[in-house]
Amino acid sequence: MIRTSSILKNCNYRYIHCIHRCLLNEANLKDRKTHNVERVSNEKTFEQALEEERKVFGELFEAGARVENMRHTNASKIIDKYYNGLQDNSEGTSVKKEKIVFNHSQRAQRKLPNKDHEFLKETAGNDYVYERAEPSAISTKTISEQTRTLLEKIFDEDNSINKSNRELLNLNLRKGSGMEALRQPVAHSNVKFSEEVMQEIGNKIRYQTTLDQVLEPHIDYLREAVKSDYDLLRYLKQSLDIYKKRNKDLELKMNAESSNIFEDIRSACINKPAELPKPLAMTLPYIIVKSLRLGDFDFPADRKYTLISYVYNECKNNMDASLYLTICNVDFYNLLVQLLWENFQEIRYLRRVVTEMSVNGVIGNIETVDILDKIVKEMRSLNEDVFLEAGEQLSADEEVSSSANKIVNVGVLWNKDTNNDLLIVENYLKSLKKNLTRDR
């Protein structure tokens, strides 16, 4: 017989063992729940941080785009105050059209009607006389006709030069290897350019001319202070440091409250010619490109490329995205492309630059088209000359001339990558030409 004590003992053992196992299971379940909660919390925190980062960068680029659009939209209105002579009366506002006459025989000296005309008189010099519109005055229509002639000259392909050789080259290449990368771009004959494009070009010319006038004291200071490329490098570094430490609120307030921003720049430049006047978002991009293009600084091309590379890398590596958006505009990229080609003559470097311009929304202008058009023509003419020389040698060789379908792929460092890079640059050039000719 089984004793009662033994039964109770066994029951108590099983009961205690069962309780221990339940406690372990409950503890494991709590650990898993806690781990899942922590993992979900970490994922939510990471997603929130990622979303905030995207929002910050999106706001920065949107703000830069708005500033750029506002600058282009209001540039014409701001500059017209100096070239059209806005006159305020107590009864109302009346606009009095004035024209700038160059090299006029009768230079009538008269009192200018308002402060804006006095500003132009002081900054223009002795070669400008302000009179009412006459047949000899340079009007908007004359500027438009000159701009149209310049555009047609740049866009017109010279088809008479090596036309037969170029057609023979394309025919042989397509028969032999089917290389589509060497196809010639379609000639732009009888191109009609939109009035909006020519108006933008005219506004930019007037904008650059006005900045030349108001920043003349500071440019004269640079001519005296800069004796070597090291001096210019030190000046560029100091200017970038000042921009990084600028008071953003003060500049925004200055832009909002100032009625004549060019006059403010002129006054600050006259009072302190050694300092670059504010707002730096307007003056710094101009002075960087201007200093690298001044004829007084006759530096070698490699030194100029070193200077512009320093500015370019500083803008790209800085945490402040506005530095890149402000400095690296289309004029800066045009100079960068020009110096890249003068120093290296490698199409792959140009391909990287034009790709970056497309990705970052830097739209090329007529100067970009002019620079790239010359580079593409130089690449093609150079390759054609080498190909024709090789073709003459092949025709003299009896063994090779018997094979009609054979072709030799020759050129200056001409390979598959070169063809692809040149094709990308050509496509970018075509898109720029279409953008300048289409109605917006």
Curated annotation (Swiss-Prot):
Keyword RNA-binding in record: yes
GO terms classed as biological process: mitochondrial translation; mitochondrial translational initiation; mRNA processing
Pfam families listed in its UniProt record: Mtf2
Keyword annotations of the record: Mitochondrion, mRNA processing, RNA-binding, Transit peptide
Name of the protein described by the UniProt record: Mitochondrial translation factor 2
This protein's record includes keyword Mitochondrion: yes
Location of this chain's protein in the cell: Mitochondrion matrix
A GO term from the CC aspect: mitochondrion
Organism: Saccharomyces cerevisiae (strain ATCC 204508 / S288c) (Baker's yeast)
Residue range of the transit peptide in the UniProt record, numbered on this chain: 1-15
Single annotated GO MF: RNA binding
Miscellaneous comment: Present with 2060 molecules/cell in log phase SD medium.
UniProt function note: Required for the processing and/or for the stability of the CYTB and COX1 intron-containing pre-mRNAs and of the ATP6 transcript. Could be a stem-loop RNA-binding protein that plays a role in determining RNA stability.
